[in-house]
């Protein structure tokens, strides 16, 4: 399995049977400078969304139309995407598991919000925010936390799914900050590797992963992959 951070909370996940984009905010993403957008979306089969904010839904509609990708999202967000012309949708909700070729995806809790502005400038709620747990046939289990704070039921997520790789928001202000994110990883999970995200993009959130790296320093069993956007990491089952 190969995982590429595309800046902010966007990732490309490649396995033998699927190419999945998670929260594909590319155009307008300050953290995606230098990213080859065509390369990032090449061969995409699925798009998975954690929640309905513009910096996570991003380019979903355009990518889904161009590539015929199936979009996986909470039911309310999926309905809205259908109204925007997305044809291949697989809706779910918190606690639900969806099966696709080569992987399953489970919607788990996240502490955040989920809404988009309408043309009239009114905020439209788009279901609950989620984290997403991916179980693959031939690759380690992956947990993208979405946008969230720490919460004690992370212990249940670990008990149920035993994720080996974590994608963790660390930028503060709209999610937990680096020190709290490190606490979440150490207290509730046994990750082999973690990829921090939701930082080094907008100026009002943290610009570096320094606080997270410092918080993880006394937990050497977990490898912190705080590399520049565009870096490709490979993982074996």
UniProtKB/Swiss-Prot annotation:
Q: Which GO terms describe its molecular function?
A: hydrolase activity
> Could you tell me which SUPFAM superfamilies the record lists for this protein?
Metallo-hydrolase/oxidoreductase (SSF56281)
Q: InterPro entries from the entry?
A: Metallo-B-lactamas, RibonucZ/Hydroxyglut_hydro, UPF0173, UPF0173_UPF0282_UlaG_hydrolase
Does the record carry Hydrolase as a key word? yes
One Pfam family per UniProt: Lactamase_B_3
- Keyword Cytoplasm listed? The answer is no
Instruction: Kindly state which keywords UniProt assigns to this record, in alphabetical order.
Output: Hydrolase
Cite the PANTHER family for this sequence.
UPF0173 METAL-DEPENDENT HYDROLASE MJ1163, UPF0173 METAL-DEPENDENT HYDROLASE MJ1163-RELATED
Q: Which HAMAP family match?
A: UPF0173
Q: Which family does it belong to?
A: Belongs to the UPF0173 family.
Q: What is this protein called?
A: UPF0173 metal-dependent hydrolase BCAN_B0597
């Amino acid at each position: 399995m190969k995982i590429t951070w595309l800046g902010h909370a966007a990732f490309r996940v490649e396995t033998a049977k699927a190419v999945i984009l998670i929260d594909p905010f590319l155009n307008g993403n300050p953290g995606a400078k230098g990213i080859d957008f065509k390369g990032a979306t090449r061969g995409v089969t699925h798009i998975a969304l954690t929640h309905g904010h513009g910096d996570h839904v991003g380019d979903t509609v355009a990518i889904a139309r161009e590539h015929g990708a199936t979009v996986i999202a909470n039911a309310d967000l999926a309905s809205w995407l259908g109204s925007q012309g997305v044809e291949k949708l697989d809706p779910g909700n918190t606690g639900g598991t969806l099966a696709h070729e080569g992987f399953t995806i489970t919607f788990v809790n996240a502490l955040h919000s989920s809404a988009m502005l309408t043309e009239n400038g009114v905020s439209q709620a788009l279901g609950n925010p989620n984290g997403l747990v991916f179980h693959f046939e031939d690759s380690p289990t992956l947990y993208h936390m979405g946008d969230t704070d720490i919460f004690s039921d992370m212990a249940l997520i670990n008990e149920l799914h035993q994720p080996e790789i974590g994608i963790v928001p660390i930028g503060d202000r709209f999610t937990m900050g680096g020190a709290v994110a490190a606490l979440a990883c150490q207290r509730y999970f046994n990750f082999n590797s973690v990829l921090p995200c939701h930082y080094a993009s907008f100026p009002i959130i943290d610009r570096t992963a320094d606080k997270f790296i410092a918080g993880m320093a006394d937990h050497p069993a977990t490898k912190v992959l705080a590399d520049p956007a565009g870096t490709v990491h490979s993982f074996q089952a």
